[in-house]
């Protein structure tokens, strides 16, 4: 049957990409349907019970700045918060939160249920309705046809999913869930490049069988940080609890080495490539044979759960081997495994077949987001879901689009890397992937992106007000500091001497004084009549960073301005690269296959040389494609 409602946007899949896509689309005002095989698993943390980390925390803050729900959900569900790299510079500081799985899922569902323009329906999607290379709906397992103007696929590891525990394999999208084999077959029949990837999860351990007294304790930060720019004073964190640290040892490694032939990964049972930066324990033992131990983070799954997640012990070894090596680890001598670890292999589609909006190049109005694009991690999935949902919604009645860039966000770095370079292994975000790290900090994600979120209708009125007030306070107080002068012979200068390494020798503004490493805003506040009255720590932080890193920030801003010239030069989708004289066959093939949308994107395709970009630019100027 054909369902009588036609939707603007249908999102298939209720994982971390799906919920952000559906929420973003609905916030913009599009009539949105979220289709999931099981309503009870919406927002489920299928792997580790945590959000954030190096590079990943930046993505969460950016999702939040664009009105997304991940940061607010973890603020409602986080049971331990830490700022990583807190002693390093602001560019690489990152927030990480341990989650209560049940509370996180509950928070996501609460945020979705409060969202207008959003319907949720339980059924698996088996087929797409495609007419003239344009998607116009989906067909479910029960035969219901849902019509829509746009479709966003956020299907995670469910496409042709296969679970491996030792030499035992079974079909599954994750433990306890059936795979989406019919949809996988349908997508394979379309003109997309497809391959296989692998990821894994560790065994879960009964906390009552663990000796925590022999492990290192890891407490969260005090005061407890917030992930969302809009949570403080509105959301109260749950009770905070510690995590623990233990280590593998030579006996652990010996057990694993002696049983490698039984591992699904090493026996050849798994074809897909696993994540380089989150390897299985057997992979770590083989690749880092010189190490005599590996760190294991023992993470609680929730305030009312007895399950522990031993982060660092992902495996595809047989269950009996898992039991043996787990019990060789300090504190786990009597451990009882409640759920075995496993590897999962699944289809992904070459992200080079996507536009920067995450719409597919071959099928109009069809968007891909999350693990279907070859990424790993909740945060990477959420960022893609947000971008896909935005573009699906704003392009319903126009050619309007918006996508992040390398110079304004880690989301932009993520998507640009995927669509220009593709990936052969699960892609994980790191700060090292970004060229403009000092500008793309966690702390200023709202200042970088929330103006655009307001413009697109993604922020509610309350959050808009919080953002505008913060931005105004920063601008006004920087202006005050740049216009307040202190001379070397004044009383204010003498008051400052107790803080200074050396006396003032010339007149300076308060802003210039703030550049000195020995001074901060609160010290300057102690000087009488400076008119510095701020108490908001987030505003003070922005002012201090603006002053202390001003030289570096200005330099990166100039670099961005140079690059933006190429980014602003768009290339028509129908552009014929064979007309550009002097391009090598390799460059011609790559440009013709990938169809970059801008000269900047073309310049980042592996194998496309600066000389080739120059030839392309000259030709486009000559023929009037660019002015």
From Swiss-Prot:
It is found in: Cytoplasm. FAD binds at residues 13-18, 125, 180, 371. Keywords: Cytoplasm, FAD, Flavoprotein, NAD, tRNA processing. NAD(+) binds at residues 274-288. InterPro entries: FAD/NAD-bd_sf, GIDA_C_N, MnmG, MnmG-rel, MnmG-rel_CS, MnmG_C, MnmG_C_subdom, MnmG_C_subdom_sf. One of its GO terms (biological process) is tRNA wobble uridine modification. Its cofactor is FAD. GO terms for cellular component: cytosol. It holds the Pfam family SAM_GIDA_C. Signal peptide: none annotated. NAD-binding protein involved in the addition of a carboxymethylaminomethyl (cmnm) group at the wobble position (U34) of certain tRNAs, forming tRNA-cmnm(5)s(2)U34. Belongs to the MnmG family. This is tRNA uridine 5-carboxymethylaminomethyl modification enzyme MnmG. The lineage of its organism: Bacteria, Pseudomonadati, Pseudomonadota, Gammaproteobacteria, Thiotrichales. The gene is mnmG.
């Amino acid at each position: 049957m054909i369902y009588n409602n036609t939707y603007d946007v249908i999102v298939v899949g209720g994982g971390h990409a799906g919920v952000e896509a559906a929420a973003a689309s609905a916030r913009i005002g599009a009539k949105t349907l979220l289709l999931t095989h099981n309503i009870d698993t919406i927002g489920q943390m299928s792997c580790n019970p945590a959000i954030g980390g190096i590079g990943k925390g930046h993505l969460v803050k950016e999702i939040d700045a664009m009105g997304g729900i991940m940061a607010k959900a973890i603020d409602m569900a986080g049971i331990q918060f830490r700022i990583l790299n807190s002693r390093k510079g602001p560019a690489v500081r990152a927030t990480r939160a341990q989650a209560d799985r049940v509370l996180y899922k509950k928070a996501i569902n609460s945020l979705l249920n409060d969202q207008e323009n959003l319907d949720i329906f339980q059924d698996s999607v088996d087929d797409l309705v495609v007419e003239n290379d344009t998607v116009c709906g989906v067909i479910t397992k029960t035969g219901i046809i849902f019509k829509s103007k746009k479709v966003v696929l956020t299907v995670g590891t469910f496409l042709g999913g296969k679970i491996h525990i030792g030499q035992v394999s079974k079909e599954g999208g994750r433990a306890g869930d059936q795979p989406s084999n019919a949809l996988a077959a349908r997508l394979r029949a379309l003109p997309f490049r497809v391959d296989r990837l692998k990821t894994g999860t560790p065994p879960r351990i009964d906390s009552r069988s663990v000796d925590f007294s022999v492990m290192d304790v890891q407490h969260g930060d005090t005061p407890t940080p917030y992930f969302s720019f809009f949570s403080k004073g509105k959301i109260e964190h749950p009770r905070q609890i510690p995590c623990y640290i233990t280590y593998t040892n030579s006996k652990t490694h010996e057990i694993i080495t002696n049983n490698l032939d039984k591992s699904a990964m090493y026996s050849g049972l798994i074809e897909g490539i696993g994540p380089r930066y989150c390897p299985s324990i057997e992979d770590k033992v083989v690749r880092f044979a010189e190490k005599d131990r590996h760190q294991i983070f023992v993470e609680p799954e929730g305030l009312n759960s007895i399950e522990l997640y031993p982060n660092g012990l992902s495996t595809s070894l047989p269950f009996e081997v898992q039991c043996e090596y787990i019990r060789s680890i300090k504190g786990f001598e009597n451990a009882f495994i409640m759920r075995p670890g496993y590897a999962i292999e699944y289809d992904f589609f070459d992200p080079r077949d996507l536009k920067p909006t995450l719409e597919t190049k071959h099928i109009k109005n069809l968007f891909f987001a999350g693990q279907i694009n070859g990424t790993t991690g909740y945060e990477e999935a959420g960022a893609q879901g947000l971008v896909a949902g935005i573009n699906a919604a704003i392009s319903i009645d126009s050619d309007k689009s918006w996508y992040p860039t390398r110079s304004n966000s880690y989301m932009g770095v993520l998507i640009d890397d995927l669509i220009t370079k593709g990936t052969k292994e699960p892609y994980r975000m790191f700060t090292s992937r970004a060229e403009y790290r000092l500008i793309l900090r966690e702390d200023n994600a709202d200042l970088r992106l929330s103006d655009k979120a307001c413009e697109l209708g993604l922020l509610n009125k309350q959050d808009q007000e919080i953002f505008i007030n913060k931005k105004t306070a920063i601008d006004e107080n920087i202006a005050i500091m740049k216009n307040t002068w202190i001379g070397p012979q004044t009383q204010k200068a003498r008051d400052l001497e107790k803080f200074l390494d050396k006396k003032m020798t010339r007149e300076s503004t308060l802003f210039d004084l703030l550049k000195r490493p020995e001074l901060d805003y609160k010290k300057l506040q102690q000087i009488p009549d400076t008119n510095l009255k701020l108490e908001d720590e987030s505003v003070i932080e922005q002012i201090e960073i603006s002053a202390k890193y001003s030289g570096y920030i200005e330099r990166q801003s100039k670099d961005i301005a140079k690059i933006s010239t190429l980014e602003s030069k768009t290339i028509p989708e129908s552009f014929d690269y064979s007309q550009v004289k002097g391009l090598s066959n390799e460059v011609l093939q790559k440009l013709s296959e990938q169809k970059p949308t801008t000269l900047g994107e073309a310049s980042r395709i592996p194998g496309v040389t600066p000389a080739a970009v120059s030839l392309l630019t000259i030709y486009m100027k000559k023929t009037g494609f660019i002015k």
